[in-house]
Regions:
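Short polar catalytic/cofactor-binding loops
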Residues: 12-15
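C-terminal accessory helical subdomains adjacent to catalytic cores in phosphodiester-
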Residues: 1-5, 17-48, 58-212
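Short hydrophobic beta-strand that contains or immediately precedes a catalytic carboxylate
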Residues: 8-10
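Short helix-initiation/N-cap motifs at beta->coil->alpha
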Residues: 53-56
């Protein structure tokens, strides 16, 4: 019997010898709920695939049917833009300058998930996790707490810079995202529309339920 997996191709990651294993560990802990759901529905495990660059992540995902024909594979990337309510996620990446991604023939809406505008928006949902990571000198009160998916990348990045620049670990760096996501509470990310969508719609896909 062939072991089937849920594979999530995720954009990002730092550089270095242990970059792949560190990235996978951080995201797998955050996605533990979906891993357990996968196990309960006949999958061997949920596996995180570090895509590195954005284009490379998409390219790895779209050829998965050849490399992993028995697995359920989905894509999780930064939106890099606002996503209007009700918009089709594949339309977002098809029309975004620099992407122009075309949905593979086998993929549905539930095979693509977006972090709006980017992963840092998800990190900001859990300010306790940021406090735990950056420790002394972190200024929690400088981070926004409302309408996070409507805030631009610049707004979030500037707020993170101001909140972390005097901390024990210094200013936030993009390569730290996978370390922080490891301690972010999924329930906090679920307060965002697209965060909730990841857990709800991928959960239904894992259970084999009809798409809504």
């Amino acid at each position: 019997m062939v072991n089937r997996h849920v594979r999530i191709y995720i954009e990002g990651g730092a550089e270095g010898r242990d970059a792949n294993s560190d990235f996978r560990r951080g995201w797998k802990k955050f996605l533990k709920e979906l891993h357990e759901l996968a196990r309960a529905n006949g999958y061997h495990s949920l596996e995180v695939v570090r895509g590195k660059g954005r284009g490379n992540t998409f390219n790895s995902f779209k050829v998965h049917e050849r490399e992993h024909p028995n697995d359920l594979c989905v894509l999780l990337v930064d939106a890099e833009t606002a996503v209007p309510e009700g918009a089709c996620v594949w339309d977002v990446v098809a029309h975004r300058e620099g992407d122009n991604w075309q949905r593979p023939s086998w993929a549905t809406e539930n095979h693509l998930y977006l972090m709006v505008h980017f992963v840092e928006t998800w990190l900001v949902t859990d300010q306790d996790a940021l406090q735990k990571f950056f420790k002394q000198g972190f200024k929690q009160g400088l981070l926004p707490t409302t309408h996070l998916e409507a805030r631009s990348k610049d707004d979030i990045e500037q707020a993170l810079e101001k909140a972390t620049q005097g901390s024990s670990k210094g200013s936030y760096r993009h390569g730290q995202a996978h370390e922080i996501i490891e301690i972010v509470r999924p329930d906090r990310v679920k307060t965002l529309r697209h965060g909730q969508r990841l857990f709800d719609d991928l959960g239904r896909l894992i259970k084999g339920e009809p798409e809504t």
